[in-house]
Curated annotation (Swiss-Prot):
Keywords: Metal-binding, NAD, Oxidoreductase, Zinc. Homotetramer. One of its GO terms (cellular component) is cytosol. This is S-(hydroxymethyl)glutathione dehydrogenase. GO terms for biological process: formaldehyde catabolic process. NAD(+) binds at H41, G195, L196, G197, G198, I199, G200, D219, I293, G294, V295, T318, A319, F320. The keyword Metal-binding applies. Pfam families: ADH_N, ADH_zinc_N. Zn(2+) 2 binds at C92, C95, C98, C106. It catalyses: a primary alcohol + NAD(+) = an aldehyde + NADH + H(+); a secondary alcohol + NAD(+) = a ketone + NADH + H(+); S-(hydroxymethyl)glutathione + NADP(+) = S-formylglutathione + NADPH + H(+); S-(hydroxymethyl)glutathione + NAD(+) = S-formylglutathione + NADH + H(+). It comes from the Bacteria. Oxidizes long-chain alcohols and, in the presence of glutathione, is able to oxidize formaldehyde. Also acts as a S-nitroso-glutathione reductase by catalyzing the NADH-dependent reduction of S-nitrosoglutathione, thereby regulating protein S-nitrosylation. Binds 2 Zn(2+) ions per subunit. The gene is flhA.
Length: 375
């Protein structure tokens, strides 16, 4: 069949909206009509050419929601008509990683997904002249129709709006999950969030959901403060307005009963390795945990004095918020529908597919939290 898609023909160039060929689902695969997709910084990272694993031509997009229209042989967990969220981190429930119970990083299709291909080593997309087009993160939601492995779709309730729950496909789950699944923040905790963009806002509301007592936001842009407060931030620090952000946080978290000070948990949402060091060193001696969410540039390295770790601090990383996609994503949709979490204020712009490049422009200008393309 033919479908409209925004194709990344080469690095550093705007996406081109065109008709492409899409082959139907093979065994263990499903075809999904994408109804809405977010535009994420990861898409921009690849399109810019900075992604060492970036492939072209490809159809980007990994933050979508839609309806199953066709299933291949052997598919049992979804059927046509089901509403789903594509998963760039699948959940096969059979590989060593899934069965370990210790990680959400399923390895079932990792090798082919990283090559922009389906599990059988081929692509379902091609140009009208037959030139193959690579898949992206196993999702390719910048196409009106896409084909995914069955293990890479989460079945969700049918009364949830596509234009909001698409954000659960990446940003919402990444931020909230880092709090709930990775850090396991407890009631009454003191926490710091570095970087108050889309991911940071979701970390904030994850902390609010978990019952954190003091929620400190750190950002160089004072304009981020009102929205951050809306999502649960209790204190704001602009590093430009203090001599030493680590000492500022330590002082802010001291109490009459604890003159050591330091956050119980910190979260880096910046991808800046210098900020990652501050995020670790502002945590409490003996038990502080710092969670790295932000993706650093290729080849970047983190550093701190080993003494920081020997004295009880822990550095952790997280991907997709530690969420097991098919199991956890439907629950996060329920949280949204039940009013436990918010998404609507973060969807600042809605666009047509023809205007998709405007979404990247808004991102570059810092004018959007999340732009969503509606099909």
């Amino acid at each position: 069949m033919r479908t409209r898609a925004a194709v990344a023909l080469e690095a550093g160039k705007p996406l081109e909206v065109m008709e492409v060929n899409l082959e139907g689902p093979k065994a263990g695969e499903v075809m999904v009509e994408i109804k809405a997709t977010g535009i994420c910084h990861t898409d921009e990272f690849t399109l810019s050419g900075a992604d060492p694993e970036g492939l072209f031509p490809s159809i980007l997009g990994h933050e979508g929601a839609g309806v199953v229209v066709e299933v291949g042989p052997g598919v049992t967990s979804v059927k046509p008509g089901n509403h789903v969220i594509p998963l760039y981190t699948p959940e096969c429930r059979q590989c060593a990683s899934c069965l370990s119970g210790k990680t959400n990083l399923c390895t079932a299709i990792r090798a082919t997904q990283g090559q922009g291909l389906m599990p059988d080593g081929t692509s379902r997309f091609s140009m009208l002249d037959g030139t193959p087009i690579f898949h992206y993160m196993g999702c390719s939601t910048f196409s009106n129709y896409t084909v995914l492995p069955e293990i890479a779709v989460a079945k969700v309730r049918e009364d949830a709006p596509f234009d909001k729950i698409c954000y659960i496909g990446c940003g919402v789950t990444t931020g909230i999950g880092a709090v709930i699944n990775t850090a396991k923040v407890e009631i009454g905790a003191k926490a710091v969030v570095f970087g108050l963009g889309g991911i940071g806002l979701n970390v904030l509301q994850g902390l609010r959901l978990a019952g954190a007592d003091m929620i400190i936001g750190v950002d160089l842009n004072d304009d981020k403060k009102p929205m951050a407060e809306h999502f649960g931030m209790t204190h704001f620090i602009n590093p430009k307005n203090c001599e030493n952000v680590v000492q500022e946080i330590v002082n802010l978290t001291k109490t009459p009963f604890d003159q050591i000070g330091g956050a119980d948990y910190s979260f880096d949402c910046t991808g800046n390795v210098k900020v990652m060091r501050d995020a670790l060193e502002c945590t409490h001696r003996g038990w502080g945990q710092s969670i790295i969410i932000g993706v650093a540039p290729a080849g970047a390295e983190i550093s701190t004095r080993p003494f920081q770790l020997v004295t009880g601090r822990v550095w952790k990383g997280t991907a997709f918020g530690g969420a097991r996609g098919r199991t956890d994503v439907p629950q996060i949709v329920d949280w949204y529908m039940d009013g436990k979490i918010e998404i609507d204020p973060m969807i600042t712009h809605t666009l047509s597919l023809d205007d998709i490049n405007k979404g990247f422009d808004l991102m570059h200008a810092g004018e959007s939290i999340r732009s969503v393309v509606l099909y």
